[in-house]
């Protein structure tokens, strides 16, 4: 049980996919201008990333390895991610039309988020068990959402601040992301 908690903490804080492994930078920079959109993207990504980790583990264990076609891993995981995103979109559309309208554009964008594919591939490369795959995927998603929401709230505050002209826009956003990355480096010794 302790190793699962350490895996979760390590994935969320120590080995954050955005700030340490630099995966998912496109939605991190593109969707973080407003807090509401960052929360919507974070929730949708959390569900998809967790489900994609589970499905990728099952595809690897029960299809690719028994048939000795591991070389199709990347293509099959991309297909799995697309199916999970489409399934998520259909379920959200049927069960909660309000949430579907809120998340509208964000659900299809998750298919192109490299963090989702990265988590699925790293799960297999690190030989995680089924439960560890779930925890790793969920932890990566929570870490992504945490960083995205924190960054969006900082960008909203910075947009109201008096920033010098050369630093406005993407420049101050990159500086802020760098400072966030430095702050998360403080967690480095927390988990081995």
Curated annotation (Swiss-Prot):
Residues in the signal sequence: none
Membrane topology designation: Multi-pass membrane protein
EC number: 7.-.-.-
Entry's Gene Ontology cellular component terms: plasma membrane
Pfam families cross-referenced by the UniProt entry: Rnf-Nqr
Domain of life: Bacteria
Cystine bridges: none
Subcellular localization, as worded in the UniProt entry: Cell inner membrane
BP GO terms, sorted: electron transport chain
Transmembrane segments: 5-25, 39-59, 72-92, 102-122, 134-154, 171-191
UniProtKB keywords: Cell inner membrane, Cell membrane, Electron transport, Membrane, Translocase, Transmembrane, Transmembrane helix, Transport
Task performed by this protein: Part of a membrane-bound complex that couples electron transfer with translocation of ions across the membrane.
PANTHER family associated with the record: INTEGRAL MEMBRANE PROTEIN OF SOXR-REDUCING COMPLEX, ION-TRANSLOCATING OXIDOREDUCTASE COMPLEX SUBUNIT A
Oligomer and partners: The complex is composed of six subunits: RnfA, RnfB, RnfC, RnfD, RnfE and RnfG.
Family of this protein: Belongs to the NqrDE/RnfAE family.
Protein's name according to its UniProt entry: Ion-translocating oxidoreductase complex subunit A
Species per Swiss-Prot/TrEMBL record: Vibrio vulnificus (strain YJ016)
Species classification: Bacteria, Pseudomonadati, Pseudomonadota, Gammaproteobacteria, Vibrionales
Gene: rnfA
């Amino acid at each position: 049980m302790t190793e699962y908690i350490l895996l979760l903490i390590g994935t969320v804080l120590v080995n954050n996919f955005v700030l340490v492994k630099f995966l998912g930078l496109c939605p991190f920079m593109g969707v973080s201008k407003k807090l509401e959109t960052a929360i919507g993207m974070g929730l949708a990504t959390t569900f998809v990333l967790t489900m994609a980790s589970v499905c990728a583990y099952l595809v690897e264990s029960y299809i690719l390895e028994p048939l000795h076609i591991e070389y199709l891993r990347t293509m099959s995981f991309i297909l799995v991610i697309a199916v999970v995103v489409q399934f998520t979109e259909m379920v959200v559309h049927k069960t909660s039309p309000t949430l579907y309208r809120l998340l509208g554009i964000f659900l299809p964008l998750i298919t192109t988020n490299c963090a989702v594919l990265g988590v699925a591939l790293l799960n297999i490369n690190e030989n995680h068990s089924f439960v560890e795959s779930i925890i790793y995927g969920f932890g990566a998603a929570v870490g992504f959402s945490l960083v995205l929401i924190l960054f969006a709230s900082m960008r909203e505050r910075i947009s109201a601040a008096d920033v010098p002209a050369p630093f406005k826009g993407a420049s101050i956003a990159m500086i802020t992301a760098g400072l966030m990355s430095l702050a998360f480096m403080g967690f480095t010794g927390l988990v081995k």
